[in-house]
């Protein structure tokens, strides 16, 4: 009864108004699972390939009809007849069908859609929540949200270098209270910005994107908003950054537009060390460029015992790149984005490898998101303890927060929210 009888893909829109792939998987008993694939703005060079049509006459070249056709014409005939609960077999079949190291033939957006829709169909068939289907009976940790409330870099049209300034309600007793704290600081920040005559327009992920003179000015505004909301920075709420430093890296140097500085890798490490002394930072993501391995090693040796160092573009959810990082002693945490690698099975394998090496895992959205809330379930399924899914605004971000509220309510007394302990430093 859990046999796949049909697979259908279509072109839909993401939160930026760009086309993306939606896949529906139908089972013999009438069950259907649906998944919509997100996309990134600052994408790592080593990510699996997101297939775009390149036809300038449709969606400015960003159409995904080729990926849709790859699902309907190539993948569907092969997976029809398979058992939806055989996730590993289905994912491996698609990897073999593609037969490229980065899923360039069929597209990670095609493969991921089928992979996640299959998992959702199987969970629905078994009449259990998706997080329980993926993670089993021990899936009960609700992640601490890292909420992007102020945007710079590629996520905003302003002069701030750092891409994401996040608040982390690490002092909350549970997820629902942590979310409330984050929402109150978010609205407090809007009021602070308006009072100072600064813009309160939002970036791709719902965070505000005012024109500010420096990265430090952004952090100072957030500290002011935390205090105005009645919370204590450093205990109730901590800060986290996603620098997306690959976007700043040119000709072997880091170019900070806001200050006009051009810094070496070691000077960037000094920059972060000084920032850590001044602000209650507990997580730093993509502090150096995706191929600056020597710089990353310096950063980890100097600050790895003081702060969570997250590799996103560096690792791209890829177990081979993570293995190199573990071997070289680089980072102590990995960002997990399913569409960077393309299948649920490979994602879970990477998480397991990270865990064995003592790395923390942060489950993440993309800047181009949808109403799909699967990553909320994945975060709980894997007991990751941390999630990045934007500001508490815009329905594409709030969909994940609302799903986590439902899961926490469903788990009731069995739900675990570790707060600051999820960061291990």
Curated annotation (Swiss-Prot):
Cofactor detail note: Binds a second Mg(2+) ion via substrate during catalysis.
Residue positions of the active site: 205 (proton donor), 337 (proton acceptor)
CDD domains: enolase
PROSITE patterns for the chain: ENOLASE
Listed SUPFAM superfamilies: Enolase C-terminal domain-like, Enolase N-terminal domain-like
Molecular-function GO terms, alphabetical: magnesium ion binding; phosphopyruvate hydratase activity
Chief localisation class: cytoplasm
UniProt KW Cell division keyword: no
Enzyme kind, highest EC tier: lyase
Keywords: Cytoplasm, Glycolysis, Lyase, Magnesium, Metal-binding, Secreted
Domain of life: Bacteria
Cofactor(s) it depends on: Mg(2+)
Coiled coil: none
Protein residues bound to Mg(2+): 242, 285, 312
Pathway field: Carbohydrate degradation; glycolysis; pyruvate from D-glyceraldehyde 3-phosphate: step 4/5
EC code: 4.2.1.11
Keyword check for Cell wall biogenesis/degradation: no
Catalyzed reaction equations: (2R)-2-phosphoglycerate = phosphoenolpyruvate + H2O
Binding residue positions for (2R)-2-phosphoglycerate: 163, 337, 366-367, 388
GO cellular component terms attached to this protein's record: cell surface; extracellular region; phosphopyruvate hydratase complex
Function recorded in the entry: Catalyzes the reversible conversion of 2-phosphoglycerate (2-PG) into phosphoenolpyruvate (PEP). It is essential for the degradation of carbohydrates via glycolysis.
Family designation: Belongs to the enolase family.
PANTHER family: ENOLASE (PTHR11902:SF1)
Protein name: Enolase
Species the sequence originates in: Syntrophomonas wolfei subsp. wolfei (strain DSM 2245B / Goettingen)
């Amino acid at each position: 009864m859990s046999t796949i009888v049909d697979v259908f893909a279509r072109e839909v829109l993401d939160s930026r108004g760009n086309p993306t792939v939606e896949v529906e998987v139908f089972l013999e008993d009438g069950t259907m699972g649906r998944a919509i694939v997100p996309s990134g703005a600052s994408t790592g060079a080593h990510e699996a390939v997101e297939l775009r049509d390149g036809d300038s006459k449709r969606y400015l070249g960003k159409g995904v009809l080729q990926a849709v056709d790859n699902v309907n014409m190539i993948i569907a005939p092969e997976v029809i007849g398979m058992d939806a609960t055989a996730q590993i077999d289905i994912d491996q079949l698609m990897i073999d069908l593609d037969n490229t190291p980065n899923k360039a033939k069929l597209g990670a957006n095609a493969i991921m859609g089928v992979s996640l829709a299959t998992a959702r169909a199987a969970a629905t068939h078994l009449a259990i929540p998706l997080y329980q289907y993926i993670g089993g009976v021990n899936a009960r940790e609700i992640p601490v949200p890292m909420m992007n409330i102020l945007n710079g870099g590629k996520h905003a049209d302003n002069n701030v270098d750092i891409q994401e300034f996040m608040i982390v309600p690490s002092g909350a007793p549970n997820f629902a209270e942590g979310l409330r704290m984050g929402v109150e600081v978010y609205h407090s920040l809007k009021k602070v910005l308006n009072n100072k005559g600064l813009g309160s327009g939002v970036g791709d992920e719902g965070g505000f994107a005012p024109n500010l003179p420096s990265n430090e000015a952004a952090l100072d505004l957030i500290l002011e908003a935390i205090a105005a909301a009645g919370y204590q920075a450093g205990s109730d709420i901590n800060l986290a950054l996603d620098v997306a430093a690959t976007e700043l890296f040119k000709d072997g140097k880091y170019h900070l537009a806001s200050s006009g500085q051009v810094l070496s890798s070691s000077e960037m490490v000094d920059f972060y060390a000084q920032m850590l002394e001044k602000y209650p930072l507990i997580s730093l993501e993509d502090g150096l460029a995706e191929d600056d391995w020597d710089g990353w090693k310096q950063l980890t040796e100097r600050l790895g015992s003081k702060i969570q160092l997250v590799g996103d573009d560096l690792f791209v959810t890829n177990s081979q790149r993570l293995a190199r990082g573990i071997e070289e002693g680089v980072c102590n945490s990995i960002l997990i984005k399913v569409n960077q690698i393309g299948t649920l099975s490979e994602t879970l394998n990477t998480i397991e490898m990270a865990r064995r090496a003592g790395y923390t895992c942060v489950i993440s959205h993309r800047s181009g998101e949808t109403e799909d809330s699967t990553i909320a379930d994945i975060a709980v399924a894997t007991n990751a303890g941390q999630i990045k899914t934007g500001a508490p605004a815009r329905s594409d971000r709030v969909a994940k927060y609302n799903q986590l509220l439902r899961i926490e309510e469903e788990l009731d007394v069995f739900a675990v929210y570790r707060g600051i302990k999820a960061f291990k430093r």
